[in-house]
Amino acid sequence: MYRKGAQAERELIKLLEKHGFAVVRSAGSKKVDLVAGNGKKYLCIEVKVTKKDHLYVGKRDMGRLIEFSRRFGGIPVLAVKFLNVGWRFIEVSPKIEKFVFTPSSGVSLEVLLGIQKTLEGKS
């Protein structure tokens, strides 16, 4: 699964760069996978890939992401590539202890970045 994860990270780097973000990949750091910024918004991203229709992410993984993001001054983001659906993103909250992530739990990259609004009118 490492190869799929690294490939997904590189794919997400290209998507973020298309939207004007500078991106650094932090392979093997055990903290975050990507750090991205555009001078206005800074994202600390944990990247996951799954063939399933859901993904369980534990408290420990989210705790590392949240703590790094707090220290860095960025937004903690979980990016999941569902192989049969595509990319979905969610801002991670410290209140979450364990989380089952499904495609309907997240938003598109454009909504996350504030480029596109959701049907509820939220950006």
From Swiss-Prot:
Cofactor note: Divalent cations, Mg(2+) has higher activity than Mn(2+).
Superkingdom in the source lineage: Archaea
Keyword Nuclease: yes
InterPro entries named among the record's database cross-references: Hjc (IPR002732), Hjc_arc (IPR014428), Restrct_endonuc-II-like (IPR011335), tRNA_endonuc-like_dom_sf (IPR011856)
GO MF entries: crossover junction DNA endonuclease activity; DNA binding; magnesium ion binding
Effect of residue 68 to A: No HJ cleavage. Dimerizes poorly
GO biological process: DNA recombination; DNA repair
Outcome following mutation: residue 25 to A: No HJ cleavage
Site entry: Transition state stabilizer: 48
Mutagenesis / variant outcome for changing residue 72 to A: No HJ cleavage; at very high levels altered cleavage patterns. Dimerizes poorly
Consequence recorded when altering residue 11 to A: Wild-type HJ cleavage
Temperature dependence: Optimum temperature is 70-75 degrees Celsius, enzyme is fully active after 16 hours at 90 degrees Celsius.
Xref: PANTHER family: HOLLIDAY JUNCTION RESOLVASE HJC
Protein name: Crossover junction endodeoxyribonuclease Hjc
UniProt source species: Pyrococcus furiosus (strain ATCC 43587 / DSM 3638 / JCM 8422 / Vc1)
